Amino acid sequence: MFTGIIEYLGEIKQISLEKSNRVFYIQSDAASHLKVDESGSHNGICLTVESVKKNIFRVTAIAETLEKSNAGSWNPGDIINLERAMKLNGRLDGHFVQGHVDGTAICIN
């Protein structure tokens, strides 16, 4: 669960393909606070941290996530919004946000 309040910004440094999945290497000050297997919000999409080295961490978006979100359009150099998972013993500012994306839409007006 997330609050929807952006804590950090991250820069997509590298993208690699693994079958139908996209692996993102993201540089951010958030990396020093992350742990492997921790969920985080990446532009509102819940992705799991797979590795952390210095100020770069790795996450993978599977085919369904790429199909139902805008993660498939991310490119090296893009800046994305980051938020760590909400703590139940902290303040609950913002809103309850799960980060499970059902689809995308285009705003025409």
Describe each PLM feature range.
Residues 1-109:
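Conserved loop->alpha-helix
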